[in-house]
Amino acid sequence: MRSQQSLEEIAELYGLLENIKKEYEDGIHSVLRKSNPELFSNPHTIPKLKKISINRGLGLAAQNTNILKKSITEFTRITGQKPLITRAKKAVAGFKIREEMELGLSSTLRGEKMYSFLTKLIFFTFAQIRDFRGLSVRSFDKAGNYTFSLKEQLIFPEIEYDDVDQVQGLSITLVLDSSTPKSRSKTVDRVLNGMILLKFLRFPLNDCGYYDKYESFGEITQVWDKKKHLRRKRWSQE
């Protein structure tokens, strides 16, 4: 039977989960439409979280049955669902990898489990990281998805110190779903949509760094286009 303290913690977590869902579903639409009605007049252009992908690479250690079983148990506790075992698509002799060899674990969260995991990350997990200074805004990809890594599993409340034989990290990707019009289909627009959503959800992103010195997003776009041109020029020379 659960103790009164654990029941109170569960109730508190559920309350935070409901708050963050309600804030997103009821709040972000009105906030974005008021701040910029031209860009977000269509509700389909408002950024939303589609899924969270969590991965762990084990390498050749996955051939050890005990290590694989412990990793599956940890993943199940952390994510709330049993992970899929990722396998090698083709053999690589130099790395001693055979085709269909077990190499890691992967889990995809949607709906209620996605919001539950996100709430746990924001309110509990990040607070356990020593000297945590926030996450870099440079970890967005061209589609506006955000990927970051956690170095150890001990920062999650479900993992007990005595149960861990080997410290292993996780790679987490927040996949966004936003339909941008043709006028805002550039990479910088997708990244800005991702930043808007994660900031609204109180995700601990660092400030924009050197982007602060630019007066408008148009200047930032020019810098990005210039970098692309230099990159293409370097590739053509090679």
From Swiss-Prot:
* Gene3D superfamilies, per database record: 3.30.1440.10
Per the UniProt record, the lineage of the source organism begins with: Eukaryota, Sar, Stramenopiles, Ochrophyta, Bacillariophyta
Write out the function statement from the record. Binds 5S rRNA, forms part of the central protuberance of the 50S subunit.
Entry-linked NCBIfam families: PRK00010.1
The similarity annotation says:
Belongs to the universal ribosomal protein uL5 family.
One GO cellular component assignment for this chain's record is:
cytosolic large ribosomal subunit
Name of this chain's protein: Large ribosomal subunit protein uL5c
Q: Which GO terms describe its molecular function?
A: RNA binding; rRNA binding; structural constituent of ribosome
The main place the protein resides is: plastid
Keywords, A to Z, come to: Chloroplast, Plastid, Ribonucleoprotein, Ribosomal protein, RNA-binding, rRNA-binding
| Subunit structure as annotated in this protein's UniProt entry | Part of the 50S ribosomal subunit; contacts the 5S rRNA.
